[in-house]
Amino acid sequence: RINGFWYHFIDPDSGKRGWKDSHNIELSNASAGTMLLGALAAAEYFGGEIEKLTYELYETMNWKWFTDPVTKHPYLACYPEDLPKSVPYGINEAGMFGGWSAYSEHIFLYILAAGAPREEFSTGADSYYAMKTYKGSYKGETFIFCGTGAAFTYQWTHAFIDFRNLRD
Protein backbone atom coordinates (compact mmCIF):
# COMPACT_ATOMS: atom_id res chain seq x y z
CA ARG A 1 0.00 0.00 0.00
CA ILE A 2 1.11 3.51 -0.77
CA ASN A 3 -0.41 6.47 1.07
CA GLY A 4 -3.15 4.09 2.20
CA PHE A 5 -4.14 2.95 -1.30
CA TRP A 6 -3.49 -0.39 -2.93
CA TYR A 7 -3.18 -1.71 -6.42
CA HIS A 8 -6.01 -2.54 -8.78
CA PHE A 9 -5.03 -6.21 -8.77
CA ILE A 10 -3.48 -8.01 -5.82
CA ASP A 11 -1.93 -11.45 -6.17
CA PRO A 12 -3.97 -13.69 -3.84
CA ASP A 13 -0.96 -15.86 -2.96
CA SER A 14 1.60 -13.17 -2.16
CA GLY A 15 -0.64 -10.21 -1.28
CA LYS A 16 1.52 -8.06 -3.55
CA ARG A 17 0.86 -6.07 -6.69
CA GLY A 18 0.11 -8.51 -9.43
CA TRP A 19 -1.94 -10.22 -12.03
CA LYS A 20 -0.64 -11.18 -15.46
CA ASP A 21 1.91 -8.36 -15.71
CA SER A 22 2.48 -6.60 -12.40
CA HIS A 23 4.45 -3.85 -14.16
CA ASN A 24 1.24 -2.46 -15.66
CA ILE A 25 -0.96 -2.67 -12.53
CA GLU A 26 -1.84 0.80 -11.28
CA LEU A 27 -2.53 2.07 -7.80
CA SER A 28 -6.30 2.56 -7.81
CA ASN A 29 -8.40 4.90 -5.70
CA ALA A 30 -11.58 3.38 -7.16
CA SER A 31 -10.59 -0.17 -6.19
CA ALA A 32 -9.37 0.93 -2.76
CA GLY A 33 -12.49 3.04 -2.26
CA THR A 34 -14.77 0.18 -3.30
CA MET A 35 -13.08 -2.13 -0.82
CA LEU A 36 -13.44 0.55 1.86
CA LEU A 37 -17.18 0.95 1.13
CA GLY A 38 -17.66 -2.78 1.68
CA ALA A 39 -15.53 -2.70 4.83
CA LEU A 40 -17.52 0.26 6.21
CA ALA A 41 -20.78 -1.61 5.58
CA ALA A 42 -19.37 -4.66 7.40
CA ALA A 43 -18.03 -2.45 10.21
CA GLU A 44 -21.44 -0.86 10.67
CA TYR A 45 -23.11 -4.26 10.88
CA PHE A 46 -20.58 -6.25 12.91
CA GLY A 47 -18.81 -3.55 14.92
CA GLY A 48 -16.01 -4.68 17.23
CA GLU A 49 -12.71 -5.74 15.70
CA ILE A 50 -13.99 -5.35 12.13
CA GLU A 51 -14.96 -1.75 12.82
CA LYS A 52 -11.60 -1.05 14.47
CA LEU A 53 -9.62 -2.52 11.54
CA THR A 54 -11.78 -0.74 8.97
CA TYR A 55 -11.16 2.66 10.53
CA GLU A 56 -7.45 1.89 10.82
CA LEU A 57 -7.44 1.36 7.04
CA TYR A 58 -9.52 4.47 6.37
CA GLU A 59 -7.25 6.62 8.54
CA THR A 60 -4.22 5.75 6.39
CA MET A 61 -5.81 6.82 3.09
CA ASN A 62 -4.36 10.17 2.00
CA TRP A 63 -7.08 11.48 -0.29
CA LYS A 64 -5.33 14.82 -0.79
CA TRP A 65 -2.35 12.98 -2.28
CA PHE A 66 -4.68 11.29 -4.81
CA THR A 67 -6.42 14.58 -5.76
CA ASP A 68 -5.28 17.11 -8.35
CA PRO A 69 -4.56 20.29 -6.35
CA VAL A 70 -5.57 22.53 -9.26
CA THR A 71 -8.83 20.94 -10.49
CA LYS A 72 -9.67 19.35 -7.10
CA HIS A 73 -10.72 16.19 -8.98
CA PRO A 74 -9.45 12.76 -7.90
CA TYR A 75 -6.82 11.37 -10.25
CA LEU A 76 -7.86 8.24 -12.11
CA ALA A 77 -4.89 6.13 -11.01
CA CYS A 78 -1.20 6.19 -10.19
CA TYR A 79 2.03 4.42 -11.09
CA PRO A 80 4.16 5.60 -8.15
CA GLU A 81 7.03 3.13 -8.50
CA ASP A 82 7.57 2.50 -12.17
CA LEU A 83 5.84 3.87 -15.21
CA PRO A 84 4.28 1.44 -17.68
CA LYS A 85 5.39 1.25 -21.28
CA SER A 86 2.19 2.86 -22.52
CA VAL A 87 -0.72 4.60 -20.85
CA PRO A 88 -3.50 6.33 -22.77
CA TYR A 89 -3.32 9.42 -20.56
CA GLY A 90 -0.54 11.84 -19.71
CA ILE A 91 1.29 10.92 -16.52
CA ASN A 92 2.61 13.65 -14.23
CA GLU A 93 5.91 13.54 -12.35
CA ALA A 94 4.25 11.80 -9.36
CA GLY A 95 2.95 9.00 -11.58
CA MET A 96 -0.66 10.25 -11.44
CA PHE A 97 -2.81 10.21 -14.55
CA GLY A 98 -6.33 10.86 -15.76
CA GLY A 99 -9.07 12.13 -13.55
CA TRP A 100 -12.60 11.63 -12.30
CA SER A 101 -14.21 14.98 -13.07
CA ALA A 102 -17.93 14.64 -13.77
CA TYR A 103 -20.82 12.89 -12.03
CA SER A 104 -20.31 9.17 -12.50
CA GLU A 105 -20.03 5.94 -10.53
CA HIS A 106 -17.01 7.35 -8.72
CA ILE A 107 -19.05 9.88 -6.67
CA PHE A 108 -18.22 7.74 -3.63
CA LEU A 109 -14.58 8.87 -3.97
CA TYR A 110 -15.59 12.48 -3.34
CA ILE A 111 -17.60 11.45 -0.28
CA LEU A 112 -14.89 9.22 1.20
CA ALA A 113 -12.27 11.92 0.54
CA ALA A 114 -14.34 14.70 2.11
CA GLY A 115 -15.14 12.57 5.15
CA ALA A 116 -11.65 11.17 5.71
CA PRO A 117 -11.09 10.69 9.45
CA ARG A 118 -7.75 12.51 9.40
CA GLU A 119 -8.14 16.18 8.56
CA GLU A 120 -4.73 16.36 6.89
CA PHE A 121 -5.84 13.64 4.42
CA SER A 122 -9.35 15.03 3.79
CA THR A 123 -10.20 17.05 0.68
CA GLY A 124 -13.15 18.65 2.44
CA ALA A 125 -16.18 19.68 0.45
CA ASP A 126 -14.15 21.64 -2.14
CA SER A 127 -13.43 18.54 -4.18
CA TYR A 128 -17.08 17.46 -4.22
CA TYR A 129 -18.26 20.90 -5.34
CA ALA A 130 -15.58 20.98 -8.06
CA MET A 131 -17.20 17.93 -9.68
CA LYS A 132 -18.83 18.77 -13.00
CA THR A 133 -22.55 18.13 -12.96
CA TYR A 134 -24.97 18.01 -15.84
CA LYS A 135 -28.52 18.97 -15.02
CA GLY A 136 -31.80 18.08 -16.61
CA SER A 137 -35.41 18.33 -15.57
CA TYR A 138 -38.49 16.18 -15.61
CA LYS A 139 -41.96 17.49 -14.79
CA GLY A 140 -40.41 20.59 -13.27
CA GLU A 141 -37.93 18.70 -11.05
CA THR A 142 -34.23 19.32 -11.64
CA PHE A 143 -31.84 16.39 -11.40
CA ILE A 144 -28.17 15.63 -12.00
CA PHE A 145 -27.29 13.05 -14.62
CA CYS A 146 -24.17 11.43 -16.04
CA GLY A 147 -23.13 11.64 -19.66
CA THR A 148 -23.43 7.90 -20.31
CA GLY A 149 -26.81 7.43 -18.67
CA ALA A 150 -25.78 3.95 -17.49
CA ALA A 151 -27.83 2.62 -14.58
CA PHE A 152 -24.63 1.41 -12.90
CA THR A 153 -23.50 5.02 -12.57
CA TYR A 154 -26.50 5.83 -10.42
CA GLN A 155 -26.74 2.57 -8.52
CA TRP A 156 -23.14 1.92 -7.45
CA THR A 157 -22.64 4.62 -4.81
CA HIS A 158 -26.29 4.45 -3.80
CA ALA A 159 -25.82 0.78 -2.89
CA PHE A 160 -23.55 1.94 -0.06
CA ILE A 161 -24.73 5.46 0.84
CA ASP A 162 -28.29 6.40 1.72
CA PHE A 163 -28.99 9.69 -0.05
CA ARG A 164 -32.62 9.93 1.00
CA ASN A 165 -33.59 13.35 2.32
CA LEU A 166 -30.25 14.84 1.22
CA ARG A 167 -30.02 17.72 -1.20
CA ASP A 168 -26.98 19.35 -2.72
Range-by-range predicted roles:
Residues N3-T34, L40-A41, Y45-D168:
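Extended ligand-binding clefts on enzyme/binding-domain cores
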